C-alpha cells in the first residue's frame, strides 16, 4: 500500500496581538540551534577528534560516548588515533590517495540532534565513520559513533562482509526538499524499519522500495549490478548482486540473518535521509516445518542461535515516499552484542 502524505493543518491565532509583540513571538518560535548551528557542533567535535583533544569540543560534563556499541570516555578509541576526517571544505588530498572526501551532514532540529557520515583515516588505514550528536543547552550530551576501517571488515570475505572501499560510496542527493516533498519523520523511520525487518522475513512486501533503489555495502554496490551473475535456481544458497533491492529481498539473499536489532538515530526530514544503526545476527536457519498428514504444520523449531553478529551503520534516502538509496557500513561485532543505547 502506498504511504499517504500527512495533511498539513493551518492554525489561526484567535487572540489579537500587537505589532510590537510579533517580533518577540517570532524569536520564540525559532529553534535554539538551527541546521547551521547543529552542523557547527559536528565540525567542532570532528576537529576535536582530529586534535585528539576532547577539551576542544563543547562537551557536557556528563556526556555519554560510545564507539561501535562500546561505552568509552571522550578521547578514547578512534578519538585518540584519528589521522584524517573529511570535513566541509576538505579535498581528496587530506585523506590520501586510497580514501575519499565523501561526507554527509544531517540535522534533526526538533530533537537537537546532528549527524555525520564520511570518510576517515586511522593511522593511515582508510575508513568510514557514522557519528550522532545530541546538543542540549549549548553542550554536546551524547556522542555515538560507528567506525569501520578497511582492515577490520571482510578480510577478503572470510567472514562474509565485503572489504571496505571508501572510494566506492556515492553521496545521496542532499539538497533541501520543498515543503510539499517532505514526509513525516514517523513515516520515514517506519519505512527504514520495514526494510531492516524484511532482511529476516525474506519478503519485500510492505517495504516502500523505489524501482531505481541502489544499495552499497562498505562501498561495494550490491544491487542492480549490470554484469553480475544471476542467481542459480539449482543452488538455493547462491546470491547475486544483479537483482534490484526488492528482488534481492525476495530471493533469499539474506536467508542467513535470523535477527535484526535496529534503532533510528537521526531523521533529516528536510533532506529525506534516515540514519540508523543495527546489530545483525546470523545463524544457520533450519528448513521450514513441513505439513503433517492432516495438513497442519509441525511444531516450530527452537530459536536459531547466533553464530555471527555484524554491526551496521545505514543511511537511507527517501524520495516520493520510496527508498531510493541504502548506504551501509558494516563490521564484525561480538556475538549478540547490544547497540549500547536504549531504544
PLM regions: where:
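N-terminal secretory signal peptides that target proteins for export/translocation
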Residues: 1-4
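C-terminal and inter-domain tail/linker signature
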Residues: 25-343
Amino acid at each position: 500500500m502506498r504511504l499517504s502524505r500527512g495533511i498539513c493543518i493551518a492554525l489561526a491565532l484567535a487572540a489579537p496581538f500587537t505589532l510590537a509583540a510579533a517580533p518577540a513571538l517570532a524569536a520564540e518560535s525559532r529553534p535554539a540551534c538551527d541546521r547551521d548551528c547543529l552542523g557547527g557542533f559536528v565540525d567542532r567535535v570532528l576537529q576535536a577528534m582530529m586534535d585528539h583533544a576532547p577539551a576542544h569540543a563543547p562537551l557536557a560534563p556528563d556526556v555519554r560516548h560510545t564507539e561501535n556499541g562500546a561505552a568509552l570516555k571522550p578521547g578514547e578509541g578512534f578519538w585518540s588515533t584519528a589521522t584524517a576526517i573529511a570535513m566541509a571544505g576538505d579535498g581528496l588530498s587530506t585523506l590520501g590517495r586510497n580514501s575519499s572526501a565523501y561526507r554527509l551532514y544531517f540535522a534533526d532540529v526538533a530533537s537537537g540532534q546532528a549527524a555525520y557520515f564520511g570518510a576517515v583515516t586511522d593511522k593511515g588505514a582508510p575508513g568510514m565513520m557514522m557519528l550522532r550528536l545530541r546538543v542540549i543547552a549549548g553542550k554536546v550530551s551524547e556522542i555515538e559513533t560507528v567506525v569501520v576501517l578497511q582492515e577490520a571488515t571482510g578480510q577478503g570475505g572470510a567472514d562474509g562482509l565485503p572489504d571496505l572501499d571508501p572510494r566506492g560510496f556515492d553521496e545521496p542527493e542532499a539538497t533541501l526538499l520543498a515543503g510539499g516533498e517532505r514526509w513525516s519523520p514517523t513515516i520515514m523511520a517506519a519505512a527504514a524499519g520495514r526494510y531492516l525487518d524484511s532482511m529476516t522475513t525474506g519478503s519485500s512486501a510492505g517495504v516502500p522500495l523505489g524501482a531505481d533503489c541502489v544499495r552499497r555495502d562498505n562501498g561495494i554496490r550490491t544491487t542492480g549490478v549490470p554484469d553480475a551473475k544471476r542467481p542459480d535456481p539449482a543452488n538455493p544458497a547462491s546470491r547475486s548482486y544483479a537483482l534490484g533491492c526488492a528482488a534481492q529481498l525476495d530471493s533469499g539473499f539474506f536467508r542467513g540473518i535470523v535477527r535484526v536489532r535496529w534503532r533510528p538515530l537521526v531523521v533529516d526530514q528536510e533532506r529525506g535521509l534516515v540514519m540508523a544503526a543495527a546489530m545483525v545476527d546470523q545463524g544457520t536457519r533450519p528448513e521450514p516445518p513441513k505439513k503433517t498428514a492432516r495438513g497442519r504444520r509441525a511444531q516450530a523449531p527452537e530459536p536459531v542461535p547466533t553464530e555471527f553478529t555484524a554491526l551496521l551503520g545505514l543511511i537511507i534516502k527517501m524520495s516520493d515516499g520510496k527508498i531510493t538509496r541504502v548506504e551501509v557500513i558494516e563490521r564484525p561485532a561480538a556475538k549478540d552484542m547490544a547497540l549500547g543505547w536504549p531504544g
